[in-house]
Amino acid sequence: MTCSGAVPVFTGSSIRQPVCGSIHETRQLFLTGRSTVAAHVRNVLDAIRDTDPEIGAFVAVAGDGALREADAADRMIRTVGEAAFRERPLLGVPVSVKDLIQTRDLPTRRGSLLPNRRAAADAPAVARLRAAGAIVVGKTTTSEYGWSASTVNRLAGPTRNPWAPDRTAGGSSGGSAAAVAAGLCAASIGTDGAGSVRIPAAFCGVVGFKPSFARIPYVPPCADRLAHVGPLARSVADVADLMAVLTGPDQRDPDSSTGPLASRAAPASLRIGWLEFPGTSDEVRGVTEAVPSVLTGLGHRVERIEVPFADPYAALVDVVAAAEADGTAPEDEHLCDEGRLAVVRYGRSLTGAAVIRAEEVRMTLRATLAAVMERYDLLAMATVPIEPFDADAVAPPWAADPADLLWLAWSPATYPFNITGQPALSLPAGLTSRGLPVGLQLVGRPGDDDLVLRLAARVESELAHTMLPSGCESQGGR
């Protein structure tokens, strides 16, 4: 994968080249015999060991278990050849898993010093990745219990952006996005309750997809019905490959049994609503202002619109806080991040009537966006209206009190689509004058996941940005 207009991953790093390319490139390594799976996975584990201390993307690494799985993959390839990839489409592909998602062989700490028991079984998404042949190389960092949209916690410290280590990777799936961007895995699985896949994807210059609600089972289910499991990868094609493996019902998640239907047939010319949120920086606008013309050039009709989004505190924070209220015993509060503890305490103060009012606001927002989507096939906008801020912070300095969930003040474009359950994808739109990635978000109607992916692939090819933070080609190994 040739990189254009890119910057070094780390000044003085011993790893100058990203070890993992795309899923397609990784398959080609094995199919052409340029690398065995075992050699490639060994290179990945070495790169994590040598490079990750500078990023902080991983909180646990698989080690010998991953190498045993790699040896088994090599035996399968030697035995049946190319047919192995038809049976197991992700065979040998190194992936990572966010530390909120259960894995049977690696601890799930949830970014917290609080005690956690190792899961007895993989979450559905992890089990499906393994069944497709993917090799889990480690667990990636998150803010404590995913509470904030940056990835800083007392367990592992800050996760840094591979494009600029003094900047945040975003969150709460910041470790997943940073690991993919740095070439330490080909793909990762994150969670998204208010933008936690899309925000770090935008900041780190990778593709992140929050599918329609319950398209991928979430186990154990979340009471607030906001959380989605979603993939992060180097390209839209990689995300589509992952979705083919990850989707489908699971009886442990009742919502997944009634998940969305396949996408409707798309008209040749789509109606697209273009939104710009207040507070969009000049740097972000400078990257995204050309997107409406790109969409028009693809034959679509683009109209600049405004949508009256609901108050995020009433629509989101009260419900999240109520769900968190009993999540931490008072005697364990000294182990918690202050920001998450503020959420827990606020949740304890809420009355049942306040939570019902919050649900009414959510219903109003769903109705508002349903009416908008009667007029438009998709919406498009900058994923995040600002550039990545300081890596050690949980919010930019002007967001007065991060403990009050003020990521909603600097990232207003993501949370509404968790409330509505609509599919929303962030793909790289380009780089600012400081060389920092900017994301473009595409949003479809509930169930129109395939339509979002198809348009994203076209836009990706038109923008022609290879968003890999290195001035070189991805490398395999023998």
What are these regions (language model features)?
Residues 37-42, 71, 283-306, 328-331, ...:
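Acyltransferase
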Residues 44, 66, 239, 272, ...:
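Residue-level signal for inorganic ion chemistry
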Residues 26-32, 96, 114-115, 227-234, ...:
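Short, well-ordered beta-strand elements within core beta-sheets of diverse protein domains
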Residues 207-286, 463-478:
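A short helix-breaking turn/cap at a secondary-structure junction
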Residues 44, 92, 131, 185, ...:
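Glycine-rich, small-residue loops and helix-cap segments
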Residues 3, 7-193, 293, 298-299, ...:
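Gly/Ser-rich catalytic/binding loops embedded in alpha/beta enzyme cores
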Residues 89-110, 269-275, 319-370, 382, ...:
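Short helix-loop capping/hinge segments that flank enzyme active sites or metal/cofactor-binding pockets
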Residues 121-246, 418-419, 423-432, 436-439:
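Short glycine/serine-rich loop segments
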